[in-house]
Amino acid sequence: MFILRQAEISDIDVIMQIEKDSFVPAIMERREVFEQRLNVFPEGFIIFEDSKNHRSAGYICTELWDCIPSDKDFFAVGHDIKKLHNANGSALYISSFALLKEFRGAGNGKMLFGSALNFFKEKFNTENALLMVNEEWNAARRIYESYGFRKYMVFESAFPAVSGSGFSCGIIMKKSFSANAE
């Protein structure tokens, strides 16, 4: 069982631990980037806490955008949240979602992603949600697809390849929250 709570600046060390456990160095966010996101939009940054021992298991970080940009730079690691974030934005951008390895593989990722998505949908009343995922991260893509996310656009060479040689595409996935969903 997990508790979803708003992240705080005091969580930065555990956020960085989760980040290091989840991503290769080339796509890890810097501490300063997370600090900026916590300062600009704290309501959009959630920690997943194990309710049994109150240990942080993962996080999800979001932004609110007025539109969906077509420029890859807005989706890049280290992008400046202040360039597109608008507290009244209609698009929920999920900039990062990560779990410690020890909490993966038991359905926790799917359950926590769904819980967070429902929380954000109700709290911010957005029209749609979007995220970018490495084309090679099949387990993550299955989670997102199970909640209605579909391929919206593709950016070539957006991620280092899992093999360590070359690059792989970044897939922008989108989900509509409207009654007339796509």
Each language-model region and where it sits:
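Glycine-rich phosphate/pyrophosphate-binding loop shared by adenosine-nucleotide-utilizing enzymes
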Residues: F2, N53-Y59, L92
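Conserved active-site alpha-helix within GNAT-family acetyltransferase domains
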Residues: K110, E122, E135-M153
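A short beta-loop-alpha structural element at the N-terminal edge
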Residues: F2-I15
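Conserved GNAT acetyl-CoA-binding A-motif
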Residues: L92, F113, F120-V133
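Conserved acyl-donor/pantetheine-binding loop and adjacent beta-alpha core of acyl/acetyltransferases
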Residues: C61-S96, S157-G166
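Conserved beta-strand-loop-alpha-helix junction that forms the acyl-donor binding cleft
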Residues: K101-R104, A129-R141, S157-S168
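Conserved acetyl-CoA-binding loop-helix of GNAT-fold acetyltransferases
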Residues: L99, G105-F119, R142, S146
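Active-site rim helix/loop that mediates acceptor-substrate recognition in acyltransferases
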Residues: P25-S51, A57-C67, H79-K83
